[in-house]
Regions:
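Functionally constrained cores in energy, signaling, and assembly domains
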Residues: 5, 123, 143, 221, ...
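Peripheral, solvent-exposed domain-edge segments
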Residues: 17-86, 260-330
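Beta-strand-dominated extracellular/periplasmic modules and repeats
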Residues: 69, 73-275, 316-321, 327
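A signal for specific C-terminal beta-sheet/loop modules enriched in small/flexible residues
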Residues: 1, 11, 52-55, 59, ...
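Short linear sequence elements within intrinsically disordered, low-complexity coil regions
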Residues: 12, 103-104, 279
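Fungal secretory targeting signals
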Residues: 1-27
Length: 330
């Protein structure tokens, strides 16, 4: 049996995609930081194997699992396809143009969005101690099945309700830089987060993300500790210790299968950027990094859902910050 994956999300950075913006000294420092995190994460490999193995066995045996595991299909497939790779994050961080501060504290972010059900089994491990990190707030945000982000729906051309295309007035590549794009609404679908439990694990319920012009399919992630929940049920994004911002990607074969189904086929976005073409993925998936989730179809039918395992390796001493000025105000 192959070793289990540690998927410590590679971090997105505008600087990382245009090294001309960095001085020689900055490039040298960045390389040293990457190497240090790489070494720290690899030292944690045995702990991560045990961490993921435990989660998979619990999931396999859990009778009240939210998705249908009929026929043993999931268990057999996952054991055959476990990857063997240790990965770490790059030191620079940015959230992209469609992040919104103060999102809802919730595990299920689907709201009324149609699409293939997606369960994210996310584990967070501290690479300074090789131990799971409890009570770490894990936040996700992504486009819906037809490539639209909540909060940025001004240019919606239709679609299946409460959808909007990524605004054309955003500079940059549509998700990899920190360009601040003005919000057009207060919609909140496919955004939110929840803390890890005492074992450093959190389950998030969403739908499989679609694509939009200029980017391959991805989900944004952020992790912070010492976080605060406001009285209105949102996280106070600037109050905690931000340890991580990144993006997770999916295998092209699974993307193709999902995008051939309804409502993904109804998109007006141009599917011209695949994993092999995405510059952000290229940056994140080199030098020993692994930017792909360990994802499996649940049951015999695609609409039964997909489960994806993600292990995020973070440095608990790191301190980053969000750059957007956009806030969600319920």
């Amino acid at each position: 049996m192959k070793l289990l994956t540690i998927f410590a999300l590679a971090i997105t950075s505008a600087l990382a995609h245009d090294t001309r913006a960095l001085s020689a000294e900055q490039l040298k420092r960045r390389k040293l930081e990457v190497e240090a995190r790489n070494l720290a994460a690899r030292k944690c490999a045995p702990a991560v194997r045990a961490f993921e193995n435990q989660r998979r066995h619990i999931r396999r045996d859990l009778k009240h699992f939210s998705l249908d595991l009929r026929g043993g299909h999931f268990g057999a497939q996952q054991e055959k396809e476990i990857k063997n790779k240790t990965c770490v994050m790059t030191p620079e961080v940015t959230e992209g143009p469609y992040f919104v501060k103060n999102e809802l504290v919730r595990q299920n972010v689907r709201e009324n969005q149609r699409g293939v059900p997606l369960t994210l089994d996310i584990g967070v491990i501290d690479i300074t101690s090789c131990k799971p990190l409890p009570n770490a707030f894990v936040e996700i945000w992504h486009a819906n099945a037809t490539g639209f982000y909540s909060g940025f729906t001004a240019e919606s051309t239709g679609g299946s309700g409460n959808t909007g295309a990524p605004p054309s007035n955003s500079t940059g590549s549509g998700g990899g830089n920190s360009t601040n794009t003005a919000m057009s609404d207060e919609l909140s679908f496919l955004r939110g987060g929840w803390p890890t439990n005492k074992n450093g694990v959190v389950e998030m319920s969403t739908v499989y993300p679609g694509f939009y012009t200029g980017r391959t399919t991805h989900i944004h992630t952020a992790v912070q500790t010492n976080w605060t929940k406001a009285a209105n049920g949102t996280i106070e994004s600037t109050e905690g210790n931000l340890l991580h911002i990144g993006q997770v990607f999916f295998d092209e074969s699974l993307n193709d299968k999902v995008f051939a189904s309804i409502p993904y086929v109804n998109t007006t976005q141009s599917h011209t950027t695949y994993n092999a073409d995405d510059s952000i993925l290229a940056e994140e998936n080199t030098g020993g990094y692994n930017a792909f989730a360990d994802a499996y179809q649940v049951g015999k039918n695609l609409q039964d859902g997909v489960i994806a395992y993600i292990t995020i390796g973070v440095d608990s001493t790191a301190r980053y910050s969000f750059s957007t000025t956009n806030y969600w105000t319920p």
